Amino acid sequence: MVTIRLARGGAKKRPFYNIVVADSRNARDGRFIERVGFFNPLARGQEETLRLDLARVEHWVSNGAATTDRVAKLIKDAKAAA
């Protein structure tokens, strides 16, 4: 099953997440099909907190990709901001 989920990056105590489309059998930070955005929970000042390619997300969801709970909330937030 294909899922849209967060893949963790960044340094220790400084998380940065890529929002990726991946096969659910692959590791959290492992191989993915496509990167559709990022989420930076510790953004400061003028830094972007969330960037998401909503067209690609809609494409994957229409093709049967499932989203995790956190990614579903981020998609909702991105749509409200757009």
Curated annotation (Swiss-Prot):
One of its GO terms (biological process) is translation. InterPro entries: Ribosomal_bS16 (IPR000307), Ribosomal_bS16_CS (IPR020592), Ribosomal_bS16_dom_sf (IPR023803). GO terms for cellular component: cytoplasm; small ribosomal subunit. It holds the Pfam family Ribosomal_S16. The keyword Transcription does not apply. One of its GO terms (molecular function) is structural constituent of ribosome. PROSITE patterns: RIBOSOMAL_S16. It comes from the Bacteria. SUPFAM superfamilies: Ribosomal protein S16. The keyword Zinc does not apply. Keywords: Ribonucleoprotein, Ribosomal protein. Belongs to the bacterial ribosomal protein bS16 family. This is Small ribosomal subunit protein bS16. It comes from Shewanella sp. (strain MR-4). The gene is rpsP.
